[in-house]
Amino acid sequence: MNDFSQPVIDSIHKPRDAANPRERYAAGVMKYREMGYWQPDYAPKDTDVIALFRITPQPGVDPEEAAAAVAGESSTATWTVVWTDRLTACDIYRAKAYRVDPVPASNAAEPQYFAYIAYELDLFEEGSVANLTASIIGNVFGFKPLKALRLEDMRIPVAYLKTFQGPPTGIVVERERLDKYGRPLLGATVKPKLGLSGKNYGRVVYEGLRGGLDFLKDDENINSQAFMHWRDRFLFAMEAVNRAQAETGEVKGHYLNVTAGTMEDMYERAEFAKELGSCIVMIDLVIGWTAIQSMARWARRNDMILHLHRAGHSTYTRQRNHGISFRVIAKWLRMAGVDHAHAGTAVGKLEGDPLSVQGYYNVCRESHNEVDLSRGIFFDQPWAGLRKVMPVASGGIHAGQMHQLLDLFGDDAILQFGGGTIGHPAGIQAGAVANRVALEAMVKARNEGRDIVHEGPDILEAAARWCTPLKQALDTWRDVTFNYASTDTPDFAATPTAA
């Protein structure tokens, strides 16, 4: 039995003339670069899908051969020559690795490279993120000649984007429905995330909305458990929404998580949410791309906002050398069609370098992404009219960080203070009041031309003199930070984790 490691391949490999069909398709093993997967003179077409991979070859594996192997294994190749290639337009369908660059400041003992690979558009099914990902992140991520592999960015051609519906609502229409402009939206996740009865759950929702939040939210793992059936949660939560709306005169909402074990159950829950008058439903990333696109189509048909919690993403986005960058996930989510997507906080408890996170937000909400290496964006990306996704900042944030959050993310974002609302020493409603007052004070100061980055703490202290709940929030959390080194910073800009 042959051991198909690089040294053995080198020992049994005989150079062939790839232009000669007799040699090119003779049985046996060829290097991927000689099979046509390395084409340094290739000029990508406007209709090509382009992927940028970070590759870490095994010792002794040439980086160009490694890039060619990634191109081959993510498109048409297998480990040996197959004569059935001659039955296809393989010269067209094979992916082309056309550029390899060393990663700046990578470890000399374990060098990394950026590999640019172009894919013919016909390789992918129209309007299917599942099919796109089956190729781009399929078997190739387990390929032995690579020590590690990470998908850093993609250029999606306009011709392919036009086959996707994108977000069912989008930022502009959502603001019109809510009649809320000129500031970020405010939310909170119900805590504790598990264990509350339906009635107590509804009370938390009411208190948060009554205190000034725009949304309350189910957490990722609250579905339908022994302590609270999903139908009870929906009923009590919507009772709270309706009561808070009547008392405040503002449009309010609660993200009802319809995630379930089957699509039939998810549709049933979504339909019930609609019957109760909810304007929004929620799903988790872990349901998969086909289910996400299915729920996006349902939301579009039913004029509902679709919120996505990115539960599970860090299992493959957090490590810098292997997996997928969240900027790619953000692109796929926009194509799949969600209206909200959790995209990081930079200053909270979860992983996120400030510049990287700003890059994720830009992917979600810009009409055209320009190359911005400092934020990890490698490609010029027009969005072909796809609606914009509202990015969500959630996880370990509090009122004392309001100036940082507003400076980092601007108005088109949702700031979700779960523990920073529910954990307020004077109660849930006081926590909501503190966050609303802090936000409005900071927006007012920004609009007056003040330097909120440097004056932010003073602005909050001034507002707290007239708002006891805000003073209590600042006294409780003012010094709470999560200032740890980021595991995933842009290669072309070193930045600290905390803004």
From Swiss-Prot:
SUPFAM superfamilies linked: RuBisCo, C-terminal domain, RuBisCO, large subunit, small (N-terminal) domain
Site (Transition state stabilizer): K349
EC number of the protein: 4.1.1.39
Active site: K191 (proton acceptor), H309 (proton acceptor)
Catalytic activity line of the entry: 2 (2R)-3-phosphoglycerate + 2 H(+) = D-ribulose 1,5-bisphosphate + CO2 + H2O; D-ribulose 1,5-bisphosphate + O2 = 2-phosphoglycolate + (2R)-3-phosphoglycerate + 2 H(+)
InterPro entries documented for this protein: RuBisCO (IPR033966), RuBisCo_large_chain_AS (IPR020878), RuBisCO_lsu_C (IPR000685), RuBisCO_lsu_C_sf (IPR036376), RuBisCO_lsu_fd_N (IPR017443), RuBisCO_lsu_N_sf (IPR036422), RuBisCO_lsuI (IPR020888)
Record PTM N6-carboxylysine, positions in chain: K217
List of residues binding Mg(2+): K217, D219, E220
Note describing how the cofactor binds: Binds 1 Mg(2+) ion per subunit.
Keyword Membrane on entry: no
Positions of substrate binding: N139, T189, K193, R310, H342, S394
Keywords, sorted A to Z: Calvin cycle, Carbon dioxide fixation, Lyase, Magnesium, Metal-binding, Monooxygenase, Oxidoreductase
Molecular function GO terms recorded: magnesium ion binding; monooxygenase activity; ribulose-bisphosphate carboxylase activity
CDD domains: RuBisCO_large_I
Cofactor(s) named in the record: Mg(2+)
Enzyme class of the recorded protein, top EC level: lyase
GO BP: any one term: reductive pentose-phosphate cycle
Job description of the protein: RuBisCO catalyzes two reactions: the carboxylation of D-ribulose 1,5-bisphosphate, the primary event in carbon dioxide fixation, as well as the oxidative fragmentation of the pentose substrate. Both reactions occur simultaneously and in competition at the same active site.
Note: The basic functional RuBisCO is composed of a large chain homodimer in a 'head-to-tail' conformation. In form I RuBisCO this homodimer is arranged in a barrel-like tetramer with the small subunits forming a tetrameric 'cap' on each end of the 'barrel'.
UniProt similarity note: Belongs to the RuBisCO large chain family. Type I subfamily.
The protein's name in its UniProt record: Ribulose bisphosphate carboxylase large chain
